[in-house]
Structures are given as structure tokens and as C-alpha cells.
Amino acid sequence: MSEPLRKPRPAGVPVSGLSIYQPMHLGIDEDRKRVQIELMYRNILLGGEPGSGKSVALNNIVAHAAISADCGLWLMDGKQVELGLWRDIAEVFVGNDIDHALSALDALQAEMDSRYDYLAHARRRKITPDDDYRAIMLVVDEVAYFSATVGDKQQREAFAMRLRDLVARGRAAGIIVVAATQRPSADIIPTSLRDLFGYRQAFRCTTEISSDIILGYGWAKAGYSANLIAPEDRGIGYLLAEGGIPRRMKCAYLTDQHIYSLVEHARRIRRAA
């Protein structure tokens, strides 16, 4: 692998507010070019084994949304560790309570339907910056905790159905879904769900099959397999944009101190908005 991706790339802390409609910075590719994505009207799926760097990417995404006053944060983290650092500025924070998770998804579905009623009345196709609606970013880490571990079978299935609905219908209503899993298996991320994500990012996986479950069938045989990423290369993964080919990149790293500073910065921005 090329040397530029092996060197750690600490991320700086922004000094001004952003917008969720602007591209967000994720890191650099093998040619040291900036990698940015536009998540408004899109969703992203992140997958990889424990310690592969999903949380590195996740924090970059949440950081951009946090300092965007035009975006609300709804965070779900069964372990309450990774996303817990951001909970002070989240409109909704769900820990290890499946009932709370289901009620939050119900509320978000109701908000989505209300926005579609507004759009139908206004004869419009999607929410824009001119509307009185802020974007909402729903971040779920880890999907398998809520869809395959906690609660009973009926609750887990209900969670999976509601999440799929938000991924499928939320984009035009200004609802962005960011989902992460360390269990990239077909029962956790079925093809019907994976294909709804406009962006997919695969970090180190144990097998080609696991890599393809995130990126899509056939990419491993085409030479884009996350199981070839070295275990020590945390934060390196393949990013696939809708209609493109996977791009090998390294995510910028935010320390805990960066995150604490960003939370305070975001608090000031949101207070002034």
C-alpha cells in the first residue's frame, strides 16, 4: 500500500459553522487528494470488523453535522461509547434501550410523513434550504445491536423495518441515515437494505464475502476487497459512491479532545442560530 495512507492524519477543528448541504471532508485517497461526500439527500452504510476504523469515519460525519446549524442529530449507540461523546448536542440520544429506539424511530417516521404532506401541498419534490425544516441526521452504531441482539424477535424486526423505511423514504424529506455495523453479514445487512444506501464504506473485513456485503456483490473479485486491508491500517477503507467504483482512502482522525472542542463549538453555533 502507498506510504501516504499509512501516515496518521490528525484532523483540525473548524473555526466556523458549516451547512449540511455542503460537502463533508472524510480524509485523503492514495494520491493525497481530499475525499469529500455530499450526504444531503443520501445515506451512508459503514461496515468492518471491530477496530477497523468505522468510528473514525463516523466521527467525521457527525462532526460536520454537529457544526451545521441546519441539521439536527438523532444518535443511537447501544454501547454508548462512540456517539456518547456527542450526546450533549443531540436532539435525541438512544442508548441500550430498544423501547426508546423504537419510539424514536416512530417519531422520526411521523416527522417524515408530515414533511411529505407539506411537500405534496407545496407541489414540491424535496426539502430545500429555503424551507422551515432542518435536515435530520439519524446515526445508528451498531445496527446489529438493535436488529439482532437486544429485545425480543418482534422488537428487533420492528426496528429493522422502521430503519429500512427511513433509508428508503427519508432522503427527499431531509432525513439522512448513517448506519454502521461490525457484523457485515447477510442477516444484518440484507441486499434489499444495502442497495438503498447511496454511499457505502467498507473497512477491514475478515472475508471477501463480508466486504461484498457492504460494497456490493462482485467488487471483491474485481480487486476491491476490504479483507486485503492490513489489520494495523485502522481507518483505511473502500468508499463507494452511487454509480462509481470503490476508492481506497484513509479517514481523518479526530481525537477525543477534538470532539470535546467541536461539541463546545457546535453548542455556540446552535445557540446563535
Could you tell me what each predicted segment is?
Residues M1:
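Acidic-aromatic/histidine active-site loop/patch
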Residues I127-I136:
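Short basic/glycine-enriched coil/helix segment immediately N-terminal to the Walker B
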Residues P4-A122, I136-G223, N227-I229, A252-Y260, ...:
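P-loop NTPase catalytic phosphate-binding loop
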Residues M24-L26, G235-A241:
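Short polybasic amphipathic segments
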Residues K126-T128, S225-I229, L239:
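Short proline/glycine-enriched turn/loop segments at secondary-structure junctions
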Residues R32, E242-G244:
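Glycine-centered tight beta-turn/hairpin loop motif at sheet-sheet or coil-to-beta transitions
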